[in-house]
Amino acid sequence: MTTDPANRSQPGATAPLSDLHEQDARTGGADAAPAPTTSPVSTGPPERPPVYPQHPSSGTWHPVSTAGAPLSVRDVDAAASTAPSAHTSAQATARSSVRSPSETAAAGVVLRDLADEYAMLLCAHDPEAAARTGLPGGAILPDYSPAGLAERLSAERSLRHRVAAVDRSTGSDELLRRHLLERLETSIQFISAGEEGGNLGFLSSPFQQIARQLHRPPETPDRAGSEEADLAEAEAKWEDAWNLHRTRLEALPAALEGLAASLATSAEAGAIAPLSQVDVVAGQARDLASRRTRGLPEDLPATLHVQLQEADISARRAALDFASHLRTTLSPRAPQAEGVGRRRHALWMRRVLGTRVDPEETYAWATEELARVIAEQDAIAVDILGPGANAHSLNRHLRADPTQALRPQDYTIWAQEVADEAWDVVVGRVLDPPDGLGRPRVRLGESGAGVVRYEEPRGTGGERRPGVVLRSLADGERLVWPWMERTTVLHESVPGHHVHVGAHATSTRLTAWQRYLGSVAGCDEGWGLYAESLADELGLMPTPEDRFGRLAARRWRLARVLVDLGVHSRLPVPDDVAALPGASREWNRATVTAVLRHHTVISEGRLRFE
């Protein structure tokens, strides 16, 4: 196992599978290549956390000198014609250790050019990538058709060969090289195995990525400006937004037809989602169709109004046809058993973690760590309530007085104060993020999911929008408990994602691919977990109740690690899990629900979402 599970809460270490805030970060076949086995190195001052080379986006990046005669991308293309099909550690060892300064600088220039080329490739296939980077995009909606995936696969293979041919890099450029190789190789394997085209999931599979582009523009223009020119500009932008919305609606039938074709192709190759996931996405497609029945703003131009109505009807029909296709064509072929199996799960884990892990070893670690966390919770309960208390009794005690809770309308004020206090304690004293980062902003999103996420600044230097912590309440959630929320706010803001992911997004030392598109979810969440511990050390969790909340969040994540590994790698159900009310010796939905309910302090609405 490349990364010791016991080190996953440390800075830069790979996070448990459950900690991934978006399950969309990046075996077998000729494209397989071993993940590098390395020891942590530091690219910053000694007091900074170590940086793991297998996740170089965590590093401190420096401008590359262009002294000497740089290699052109054409030079690298020529060298790639004799390059092997995959990078290996043996090849890395065989590379010459004698490098002149001009060779090193030239390698850095070429690698940055190749990283920029990869960013452009991703933007050409995904409008969300284009929006995040500010780079030009070529797709109205994400392209998951067989032709689109084949085109991307071919381009990624070419890029991988050319990156592998750059063999004179050192320092941060060598980290960039290895980072590009790992992400490219993992993506190539994922597409080749049919997993990209066969991906159906509840939260971040291709269907959701397509559907997210269909959000409605504002119902009226922003007429806040008092000047006539300002009003005219606002109305023009508003009309442009509705025109773009029309274009996306018109593109939906082709996008869903392409996705349906890829799902069929992947199913033939054995990459098919469990029946439960097929049914969930079919329901989401029906919901998408029903949401399209709202009326259009009255003051749109008449021609655009008619075009939108026609596009809306076509989009509704396409969504319903896609739902019907899933029910009638894919559902009969989908396995009823939950999970994808050990071989496929290994590929998914590498995509999300950026390295390979041993399922049994990680399963054993999670079991031991869960027991340790419960013991710490019980100890805090005894300190607060006295002998005989445990985590469950303290949880009931802390929730017994609703006057200690926050109302939803008060959440953002409190959470912003927590984030601002953390900024004052951390920035300039412990961490030095880029000058353009700025303080994070906390917002309350639409109710429904009951989750919280971080959205990085958009635009170089964060000029267009600051980093945002967005909290969504679960359906029916009326109270928010500060002792439980503090650790989450710190995880998402400071010293968590805002000074890690946000710092990447605003760093002028990194390429656009590194800033926005090359992150490894396991690395990002590894930092978030480390940030919670760091916040505790810095006095940002001042009460025993706050520390109990941090342990409760960790317990929840560890329980999800057990579930993820147990369900997808099909590992044995532990005795203590099988003994829980409603559980059995099989990793089915009843057993999963029993585990999550036993180890969680979240609402029933959030539990159902999970």
Feature annotation, model-predicted:
Residues R26-P36, A83-P84:
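Compositionally biased, low-complexity flexible segments
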